[in-house]
């Protein structure tokens, strides 16, 4: 007979470790909580040091009010806090933390040391392992607190096994600290990662300087200043020029009452203001700080406090729409900005000038003698730009492919080409076919360098710190495609050469999009394929109106595939007349 389970109280360490599962996801969460504690202690100088992306060591030093030895002991107990006294205080918060859970939760899953000194006292040192205080002594220190966290998750091996790579943690940690740099202009920040200084921001540096540091000088050169008050609301910050946009929302920094938040409401409202100014599926870049009455905001939605409920949402929406709309309207009136469309160069896939069939020509039927063409191969597709003359095609000779297979070009119907072999009549979807052949050429040539041209003046590319890590990690993959990239500044790269089949502006836009969407991925092989797929999609993102009839031979050579690498339809065997009518 099974033993009846009995209800019992959990011990304090277990309770704190359970709480850590909600509050502390990784090393980045630890830095976030310790930094917020430092800010709530009134610090205006904060230094963060990390090793192994925080998995090895995290140290946060501040010059805040400090704690006495007794207060340190109390702070290690759950729900001990100096920030609220009763529940109603939650709805008028001026502090970043209030639950009193973070410090005991972190202490329960790590080896921690707290060195702290309040005004007029000597200071103390407390050592905690797995939530248990193992040593406490007097220790001199200047006003403030230093908290060191070592061996994170050492006593929770399951959690430790699910931690992300140090590189991923560093990327997330940088964004966390950048948000703090932007949100609090009166605080100086320093970050030392892997024993190297990442940045040092002085507390007297204003918002414009901080935005330039985080978002890049390129953003600030044409950024639009926002500063509007309609009591009791204020919005301040910088909007990106309409010519400065990204493929994702990663370039959007939103703060409410100096808290970095994820706010679909604000993001959507601002994106709508840019609707007529940006290309499709592109997003504006901005840094905006919204100040609302504390009683209008509920940050007690999630322990991470990155979500917020806004009480008078409709009023806030109208205020945002008017504020952003006015700034954008003024910028359009005072500038000569005009949207431009990129023009792709004509693409030729073979070592020669092959005949092309315009898909807008009248329908006609003809036989195509593949044997008289310079028989192409997948490997030859990447040889672009050679202009050699090819003998004219004899359109009356019947095609013989190999010894037993024959294929004939029949006619063109809009974006579809009809061809016939012994199996029947096939509809070839030209855009998908062309895209797939180009992609196969990239895969086939993965060990070779593509023919490229050097730029007389290298193209300058300004990226975010996250995108910088991605580019530095995959320089060799770009080089295999004939794209040579080098770093010339902290977040500035030079594109020195590139294949002739992609235009300069298209190239820059593609690299930025790829870096923005893929900076969290670390698998080298997956990234190499992703780069090739992404480049193919970029080049063939526009409607193409020509189709080399010699490409039919290539399609049959590779087994006349039905679908392209991305799942789009290339070929369909026509079984009845209804399909043609469709």
Swiss-Prot record:
<dbReference type="Pfam" id="PF13589">
    <property type="entry name" value="HATPase_c_3"/>
</dbReference>
<dbReference type="GO" id="GO:0006298">
    <property type="term" value="P:mismatch repair"/>
</dbReference>
<comment type="similarity">
    <text>Belongs to the DNA mismatch repair MutL/HexB family.</text>
</comment>
<dbReference type="InterPro" id="IPR038973">
    <property type="entry name" value="MutL/Mlh/Pms-like"/>
</dbReference>
<dbReference type="InterPro" id="IPR014790">
    <property type="entry name" value="MutL_C"/>
</dbReference>
<dbReference type="InterPro" id="IPR014721">
    <property type="entry name" value="Ribsml_uS5_D2-typ_fold_subgr"/>
</dbReference>
<dbReference type="Pfam" id="PF08676">
    <property type="entry name" value="MutL_C"/>
</dbReference>
<dbReference type="InterPro" id="IPR036890">
    <property type="entry name" value="HATPase_C_sf"/>
</dbReference>
<dbReference type="InterPro" id="IPR013507">
    <property type="entry name" value="DNA_mismatch_S5_2-like"/>
</dbReference>
<keyword id="KW-0227">DNA damage</keyword>
<dbReference type="InterPro" id="IPR020568">
    <property type="entry name" value="Ribosomal_Su5_D2-typ_SF"/>
</dbReference>
<dbReference type="InterPro" id="IPR014762">
    <property type="entry name" value="DNA_mismatch_repair_CS"/>
</dbReference>
<dbReference type="InterPro" id="IPR002099">
    <property type="entry name" value="MutL/Mlh/PMS"/>
</dbReference>
<protein>
    <recommendedName>
        <fullName>DNA mismatch repair protein MutL</fullName>
    </recommendedName>
</protein>
<dbReference type="Pfam" id="PF01119">
    <property type="entry name" value="DNA_mis_repair"/>
</dbReference>
<keyword id="KW-0234">DNA repair</keyword>
<dbReference type="InterPro" id="IPR020667">
    <property type="entry name" value="DNA_mismatch_repair_MutL"/>
</dbReference>
<dbReference type="GO" id="GO:0140664">
    <property type="term" value="F:ATP-dependent DNA damage sensor activity"/>
</dbReference>
<dbReference type="GO" id="GO:0030983">
    <property type="term" value="F:mismatched DNA binding"/>
</dbReference>
<dbReference type="InterPro" id="IPR042121">
    <property type="entry name" value="MutL_C_regsub"/>
</dbReference>
<dbReference type="GO" id="GO:0005524">
    <property type="term" value="F:ATP binding"/>
</dbReference>
<dbReference type="GO" id="GO:0032300">
    <property type="term" value="C:mismatch repair complex"/>
</dbReference>
<comment type="function">
    <text>This protein is involved in the repair of mismatches in DNA. It is required for dam-dependent methyl-directed DNA mismatch repair. May act as a 'molecular matchmaker', a protein that promotes the formation of a stable complex between two or more DNA-binding proteins in an ATP-dependent manner without itself being part of a final effector complex.</text>
</comment>
<dbReference type="GO" id="GO:0016887">
    <property type="term" value="F:ATP hydrolysis activity"/>
</dbReference>
<dbReference type="InterPro" id="IPR037198">
    <property type="entry name" value="MutL_C_sf"/>
</dbReference>
